């Protein structure tokens, strides 16, 4: 079963206003939605989140809280949500009092046990949203993010619905990969939403310059530190850097919602570099370039195609890359620049839709 981005959301005091006197929404006239909850939930759904309601209802089904008194406002609330396009995949209710010492009352895990056992929860992106400390404790027990709701937050410890949307949908696209083998020790960090401040040290000056071209023309920040067996040759350092960079880019892209996906051609002096890119989730490279020299600077020209081959393997992209010209320096640089400009188009975020009819990339 594939893991899902799931929001486990409290009801009273989070989705609807909780009456301050008896803390029970047991009549229709007591039903009132929290501010901006519907547009917030719609935006979160569009961002790929599944919605699950998780609520403690003290003594539900007893004389103090008859089932029928609960059902009328609950059904009305669900009808309102559904009429506006908000869909809850599940509604989980604990009917017990605290003193009953049941296994399902929040913050215990009884209500959400099946989600955890079935491996449905993406722990990196899922969250619990609620107005009480018990909701935050539930999040801690589930090992996922906890967000405390407050319609009028006074500090950063709690958020209203508009702030919750921003918090969950504008996470920085950052990834760091460390790759250590007998030949190399490599650290690559990328931030797809920041520019400048690149720091690249591979031990190969011209290769550093080419990686900087990718970051500069790609419009993102890159930090690369490589310690490799350059006393033998440059093969392992270049190959493993490409593998680590591809993996970092893939991780930073996340589920790829809203990205352009596709990309571009670039002239450089007498060269014409052509690059077409699809962040398809499928590795494929078609590379066409001829070099008259074995090296440009301290970079072996035979490693240029191998760099892009290794990068496409871990980035899992389809890449068509070619360049024609007479100056090997220009040919190599045009390839890296063209790839950077193409990548810039492909990773740019414009909306929340997943650019695939399959529903996954």
Curated annotation (Swiss-Prot):
List residues binding Mg(2+).
10, 12, 131
Q: Where is the active site?
A: 10 (nucleophile), 12 (proton donor)
Using the UniProt annotation, give all residue ranges assigned to the region (Histidinol-phosphatase). 1-172
Q: What is its EC number?
A: 3.1.3.15, 4.2.1.19
**Mind telling me what this protein is named?**
Histidine biosynthesis bifunctional protein HisB
| Recorded catalytic activity of this chain's protein | D-erythro-1-(imidazol-4-yl)glycerol 3-phosphate = 3-(imidazol-4-yl)-2-oxopropyl phosphate + H2O; L-histidinol phosphate + H2O = L-histidinol + phosphate
Binding-site residues, Zn(2+): 94, 96, 102, 104
One GO process term, biological-process aspect:
L-histidine biosynthetic process
Judging by the UniProt lineage, the source's domain of life is: Bacteria
Q: Tell me what gene encodes this.
A: hisB
Q: Which cofactor does it need?
A: Mg(2+); Zn(2+)
Q: Give the UniProt subcellular location, in the record's own words.
A: Cytoplasm
What keywords sit in the KW lines?
Amino-acid biosynthesis, Cytoplasm, Histidine biosynthesis, Hydrolase, Lyase, Magnesium, Metal-binding, Multifunctional enzyme, Zinc
Similarity annotation:
In the N-terminal section; belongs to the histidinol-phosphatase family.
